[in-house]
Amino acid sequence: VKIESDPAHVEAATTPLHWKQGFAEDFADFPVAYRRVKATVLQEPRRLCWSDGAAACIGLNSKHLERHAHDFESCFAQGQVEYLGQTLAPVASAYAGHQFGVWAGQLGDGRAMLLGDLPSQASAGDWGFDAIDSIHLSDRIEVQLKGSGQTPYSRMGDGRAVLRSSIREFLGSEAMIGLGIPSTRALCLYGSDDPVFRETTETAAIVTRLAPTFLRFGHVEFFAHFHHHDALNHFLQKLAKRHYPKALSARHDASGLNDDDLYKLALFKSIASRTGDLIARWQSVGFCHGVMNTDNMSLIGLTIDYGPFGFLDQYDEDHVCNHSDHQGRYS
């Protein structure tokens, strides 16, 4: 399966991969924010899906894919990145959150890991944003593997993803872009015959996700709840600088707040507005996320973490797409 986009956009993309590990570099002084991890590789992986539109965001096209198929398999099916003679270790980030209205404590990337980030060739529209959104994008794109094995944040899970749900995420996220709904992107999907035990025995898969950032509400909650105040201030400064620079221009006014509090208030308002706009767009196409816990909500207004999502065929305000949501909290 190949998801295609504008051929002119795709053919223009010929840049090789130039990796950085931006998250680890940003939080080098705050090791509590992440852990170095190693992927659980897929045995005899098969590339099942590839999105030309997502690939163009990082300067790749289908010809590039065929020419460097082995290298891409090492990256996206095995989590092994070689760059400038060095092996880059993926990272899993720590966050916390409220799940179904209840404080869940420390969470984190339990079955996902950040390979690193790459130079961006994406426009706002490539993420589903309109020109009127005035979204500010950084010049890097984060690359994340989902289903890549256990991390220190996996709790009791195996860190794997099954093929069935991975196909849903791949198709769902790329479809949302086509509908004009801000979303993470799915670059590619690898499957294998490795068994994964759920209600029944299924097979393992890894989907590669792209985003301007995977930062979520839960990152803020983690730093705040566990009193990592210096890390929190550092985190908010980085977030504002890269994605909400207008918030940093907030200055002293008659409210009595100092400049530091003013920029944080401006940042909060911007995030709330972006989130409200996203949910309105979901409603406009009948999209139901299903698990709107704070660890699944993006700080820049992207649809992230496609789990038991669905679409309404006809309007039903009581529809619950997540069978685990027994009280219908996210109907």
Region roles according to the model:
Residues 271-282:
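Phosphate/ATP-binding catalytic cores across multiple sugar-kinase/actin-like superfamilies
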Residues 28-37:
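A short, surface-exposed helix-loop junction/capping segment
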Residues 44-47, 53-65, 71-255, 259, ...:
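Conserved ATP-binding subdomain of kinase catalytic cores across diverse folds
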Residues 201-204, 284-289, 293-331:
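Catalytic activation segment of kinase domains across protein kinase-like and atypical kinase folds
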Residues 31-32, 50-54, 319-328:
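Short acidic (Asp/Glu) and glycine-rich catalytic loops that position anionic groups and cofactors
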Residues 39-41:
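Low-complexity, Ser/Thr/Pro/Gly-rich disordered linker/stalk regions
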Residues 1-28:
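Charged, compositionally biased N-terminal leader segments and the immediate start
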